[in-house]
Amino acid sequence: MISRSPGIRDVGIYLCNSCPTELRRAEQEGWLRSYQQGLVDAGVAAPAPEILWRRYRRAVLYGWVAATTTAAMGDRWQPIEVGMKAMRVATQACADLETVEAFREAL
């Protein structure tokens, strides 16, 4: 599969699926500032921090879809405990970041 998407999607997937919840909560804003500065330093027309934050809040839904799809497959793709934990972590990230509300605001 090939897709094209903004880099913040990958950031959101990583932070909300692979990073421990408490660490993500404590560090995500600083990490996003570093990400934005890295884009600027590389000569990329980076979005303003508040726009990047809004995009991040929406981007985490991709990770939630991946986690819930994996969990729904039972143990066919990976041990069920792994899939269920990933789903819990991703669901918490969406709740923390008010992802549904972020989509409402965008629409």
Can you say where each PLM-predicted feature lies in the sequence?
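Active-site activation/catalytic loop segments of kinase-like enzymes and analogous catalytic loops
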Residues: 2-43, 60-79
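Exposed alpha-helical structural elements
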Residues: 10, 51, 98-102
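Charged/polar, solvent-exposed surface patches and flexible loops
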Residues: 13, 37, 54, 58, ...
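Generic alpha-helical secondary structure signal
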Residues: 26-29, 50-54, 81-84, 88
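All-alpha amphipathic helical-bundle segments outside canonical DNA-binding/catalytic cores
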Residues: 44-59
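ATP/Mg2+ or Mg2+-diphosphate-binding catalytic cores
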Residues: 63-107
